[in-house]
């Protein structure tokens, strides 16, 4: 990916604007970081959800079933986003830089998924911790409280990490997208120059025709 990005930076802007596949491979470190977070979310939420669902009993069946289902659905959401980005990149069906920047690894869609995951984990953890204060047998209360604190802590870490990530990447414009936009603006300037030159040439032809008519 880094080799493609370096090659892309050496291309002219008008040629670079047509190389859509290079837009997906820019900023490989950011893409690797977001992909690693997605893998951790899928593995952690999936394993936690399966563990809660498999340990469901009559005494603590309701909350384990609910939290396990939420964690499995959350892992499925993150996995579907990654698969969708890979499928769109392989099919090469998007030709706009804004859409590529949204769907690629490290783009806006990843930030939305991480934000939703952190919010769901935080709310679920706080809900479990609040329910653990209600009168109930000791063992389910202890398990519910520990799971709630763990989920709330993970959600807080995700939200804090996303905030630091957004602060760190704010103000940085993707170089390939910038060059693509400049290339498009360059094409627009050239077309305006051509139109002006065409108008000038037509005016010159009109003056030439009038001068010939006056001579005759």
Curated annotation (Swiss-Prot):
Keywords: Membrane, Transmembrane, Transmembrane helix. The chain crosses the membrane at residues 32-52, 65-85, 111-131, 144-164. Pfam families: TMEM125. It is a multi-pass membrane protein. It is found in: Membrane. GO terms for cellular component: membrane. This is Transmembrane protein 125. InterPro entries: TMEM125.
């Amino acid at each position: 990916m880094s080799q493609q990005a370096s090659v892309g930076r050496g291309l002219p802007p008008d040629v670079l604007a047509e190389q859509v596949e290079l837009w997906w491979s820019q900023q490989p470190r950011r893409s690797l970081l977001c992909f690693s977070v997605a893998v951790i979310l899928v593995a952690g939420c999936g394993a936690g959800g399966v563990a809660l669902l498999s340990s469901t009993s009559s005494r603590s069946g309701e909350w384990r079933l609910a939290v396990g289902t939420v964690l499995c659905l959350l892992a499925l959401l993150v996995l579907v986003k990654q698969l969708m980005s890979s499928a769109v990149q392989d099919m090469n069906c998007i030709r706009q830089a804004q859409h590529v920047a949204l769907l690629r690894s490290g783009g806006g869609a990843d930030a939305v998924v991480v934000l939703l995951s952190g919010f769901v984990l935080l709310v679920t953890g706080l809900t479990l911790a609040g329910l653990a204060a209600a009168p109930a047998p000791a063992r389910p209360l202890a398990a519910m409280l520990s799971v709630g604190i763990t989920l709330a802590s993970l959600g807080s870490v995700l939200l804090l990490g996303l905030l630091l990530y957004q602060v760190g990447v704010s103000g940085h414009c993707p170089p390939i997208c910038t060059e693509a936009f400049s290339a498009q603006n360059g094409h627009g300037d050239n077309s305006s120059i051509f139109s002006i030159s065409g108008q000038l040439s037509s005016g010159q032809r009109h003056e030439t025709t009038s001068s010939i008519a006056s001579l005759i």
